[in-house]
Amino acid sequence: MQIFHNLNEWIHFRNTLSPDLSLGFAPTMGNLHAGHASLFLASSKENHYTVSSLFVNPTQFNNPDDYKHYPRTVDADLELMTQNGVDFCILPNENEIYTDGYAYQVQENRLGQLMEGKHRPGHFNGVLTIVMKLFNLVKPTRAYFGEKDYQQLLLIQGMVKALFMDIEIKSCPTVREKSGLACSSRNNRLTPSQREIADEFAKIFHQNKSSAMISKELEALGITVEYIEEFQGRRFAAVKIGDIRLIDNYLL
């Protein structure tokens, strides 16, 4: 795997690649897990080359403590990428990415105001802006995103369509642990007792019951329920176990 620490080096290299070659792209913030690996493998099966990025994007954190405590595990992340078919990895720094000081932003004013957007003001502006920047840098044929962040996936699909971007957005199924808990970088921060509660969250959330009944059962376990909502035939949830925030969704 070839690693690029400098954006100018990447841009120069990208310009040398034949336009006849397909590029798959799976952007990440690091602290990788099996869910990320599934994106890399899906891309490597469908493209000549697979590109990823490691960048903890500050503009999508509405809580500064979350950004500060986000695990940085670069060596392990690069190893996982190498083992799962990534050919090129970009590791930009914040000054390179935000040369404008975040003066220019991508904003969506409908779906982006619901659920995650309602509870995390400004989050999706940061997500869409960094994804747009990375798309312009990588110029991928296809880009891969997990269904665990389904609202994010819908917004990226909408952005690409609205702005006439010639990129195919591929959705990949949520990867789950044996308990049914969705793989997430945040799972690593759970204590053993919190982990047991998180496993119960996954089981209860997937029950064939009303959102109100599910909320009541979760709250009885000491879980803080931010929202459980149904949207476009899916059920979405965001909860907090201690100070760890977890999200999930599934098709009804």
Swiss-Prot record:
Gene label: panC
Keyword entries, A-Z: ATP-binding, Cytoplasm, Ligase, Nucleotide-binding, Pantothenate biosynthesis
Additional observations: The reaction proceeds by a bi uni uni bi ping pong mechanism.
EC supergroup of this enzyme: ligase
Lineage: Bacteria, Pseudomonadati, Pseudomonadota, Gammaproteobacteria, Legionellales
Organism: Legionella pneumophila subsp. pneumophila (strain Philadelphia 1 / ATCC 33152 / DSM 7513)
Reaction equations catalysed: (R)-pantoate + beta-alanine + ATP = (R)-pantothenate + AMP + diphosphate + H(+)
Enzyme Commission designation: 6.3.2.1
Residues at the catalytic site: H36 (proton donor)
Official protein name in the record: Pantothenate synthetase
GO CC annotations, alphabetized: cytosol
GO aspect biological process, one term: pantothenate biosynthetic process
Annotated binding of (R)-pantoate, by residue: Q60, Q152
